Amino acid sequence: MESVETTTPSNSEIKSVETIVEEQKVNETNTTLNAEVVETPTKTEEKSKTEITNENKERSRGLEAKIKPEFVLPFKKIEKVEVDKAAKKKEFRNQLRESMNDKLCPKISKGLVCEFNETCKFSHDVEKYLASKPKSIGICQNFQTYGECKYGLNCYFGECHIVDNKTIVNKELIGKVEPVKTLNEVSNEIQIQLKTNNYPFPKSEIYFNENGISVRQIKGRNNNNNKNNNKQNDNKRKENEKDDDDDKLNKKIKLENENTTTTTTTTTTTTTETTEKTEKTEKTEKTETTETKKEEFKQSNENTEIDIMTPLKANEKKRINFENQLILAPLTTVGNLPFRRICKRLGADITIGEMALTTKLLEGTKSELALLKRHPCEDKFGVQICGSYVDAAVKCAEFIENEIDADFVDINSGCPIDLVCNMGAGAALMERPKKVEQLLRGISSSLSCPTTIKIRIGKSEDAPTAHKLIPSLGEWGACAVTLHGRSRAQRYSRLANWDYVKQCSEVSSIPLIGNGDIYNYQDVVNIYDSSKVSSIMIARGALIKPWIFTEIKEKREWDISASERLDFIRDFANYGLDHWGSDRIGVDNTRKFLLNWLSFSHRYIPVGLLDKVHYMNERPPAYFGRSDLETLLASTQVKDWIKITEMFLGPVTSDYSFVPKHNSNSYESQG
């Protein structure tokens, strides 16, 4: 972990939470009146291309942000603190995990009868549980709104509905307000089907047979249909993967199609050569018959084999507007549902769920399926999938088509993480255009909604390849492409190459969405005025200041007050409790994800403190804010972030620790 070269006031210098909030409310009016509003420059005031180029060169050096001298603190270097790598690996685990015997049975907590009785793995001792349970954090929002709390005695905000060791309900409120239901909840029955390899994929099977695509054995529990064929599947998979890696499979299909246009090749892992020949003959007869009927007269093919086999063309699919849209990027870990709700309120047009691995989705992994959840406020919502196996991707697309409510599906071909690239997925796909073609054609064939793809400029910034790939994406089935203006190798060590993004927008036949280092509305105005970029995707800029969507739409810089920022943090906490739950696990998850967000948001420098416009790669110097709360929100210390979470989620234990999931301090020297 990088050393932090900034200082913040000690705990003794920071006032209590109550005092901070009270003082901030008193100063709220003055803060708002003094807010700096920057209007859009007129044509005559716009900078020349030479001035913009020189400014971009200066920005690329990664200098410190320019803050008014009266707010800058004296420089004091803090010694580098080494972080135990093993501790970081374990960070994702719940640090306050209880043993099963210490957890109260969910049914007992609601006043119901548990059918397992003494064999139940949870505790049934209510008095013992309540005696060891921490003091209630506050008022339960669910009980106040809906008249009941589904977490019962397990609720950590249960002071208003836990009476005499029982949970009560308010009959007057029940039914008055309809609970907002999260979309894309996959039922237990479907999860079991996925885990046991019993989920049906009829469209995928037909597509595989028609295109000679090998099918891998999906990991799952004991399944009688597949158990006897595991060895045969493994042997054939190894052979087919070699062909697939060398792109020989594509050539084979083309040669066979030239010899006979009506015969289709069937390649499976569970049939013998004899049955393969029989199926080929039957398939040929079916294809010829349907083609003859098609010529003779028109008929409805709904719910027939033809209907299942025939994929929709891009222009026949559901329409979603990718022109002049502000899109929240699919942010792993931090782009969770509560954060997306914040961004929707502040002006994001389109939101995308966190990256989900195709193989994990097909295995029915609960945590992976949770990444597909959608809040009703997300009126334009996409899911992003990542994988390198064509068969898994096509099946995953069919599953999404059947079970998930999404307006489009995005293919991740831009993730630079080694763990993903070593699997041949993410940014590694750009080195294999044939694989990208197979994925796009296969996935789009299973979906009635648009398919999009997110890519980088290439493996190396010195030899970008995106301009060669982009012209073909529309033909392969993509309805839009997002281009992140960085290479796989550089990560965040340099600014995004927007000149190259603009060049690629000239050769794209489909809407091109630009992504990389968007941090103020001026950048967006310049991009739209000087290129054919259709829309803008925002990632880290939204994490640091989610109100960037408001700034872009209103074409102004928002000098947001500290109390307004604290309100967004409070809203995130409430949204988190609503999404993850108000029991112990839910509170811990909400705190963890809130801390991950604060590891980015502390980098924000209020507009009123700046001498000039702040850019993404400019490091904030040590400074103090216009109030104690503003100073606290700018702290780089984890202990202060934890203190902020305690305002809404209650105190942590004395041994609680937190290590950020991502390295948000990406200000490396740009020279």
Swiss-Prot record:
EC code: 1.3.1.89, 1.3.1.-
Protein name stated in the entry: tRNA-dihydrouridine(47) synthase [NAD(P)(+)]-like
Top EC category: oxidoreductase
Gene that encodes the chain: dus3l
InterPro entries given in the database record: Aldolase_TIM (IPR013785), DUS-like_FMN-bd (IPR035587), tRNA_hU_synthase_CS (IPR018517), Znf_CCCH (IPR000571)
Start-end of C3H1-type zinc fingers: 99-127, 134-164
Molecular functions (GO terms): flavin adenine dinucleotide binding; mRNA dihydrouridine synthase activity; tRNA dihydrouridine synthase activity; zinc ion binding
PROSITE patterns assigned: UPF0034 (PS01136), ZF_C3H1 (PS50103)
Region listing for Disordered, in residue ranges: 39-60, 217-300
Active-site annotation: 415
CDD domains reported in the protein's UniProt record: DUS_like_FMN
Reactions performed catalytically: 5,6-dihydrouridine(47) in tRNA + NAD(+) = uridine(47) in tRNA + NADH + H(+); 5,6-dihydrouridine(47) in tRNA + NADP(+) = uridine(47) in tRNA + NADPH + H(+); a 5,6-dihydrouridine in mRNA + NAD(+) = a uridine in mRNA + NADH + H(+); a 5,6-dihydrouridine in mRNA + NADP(+) = a uridine in mRNA + NADPH + H(+)
Comp. bias (Basic and acidic residues): 42-60, 248-257, 274-299
Keywords associated with the record: Flavoprotein, FMN, Metal-binding, mRNA processing, NAD, NADP, Oxidoreductase, Repeat, tRNA processing, Zinc, Zinc-finger
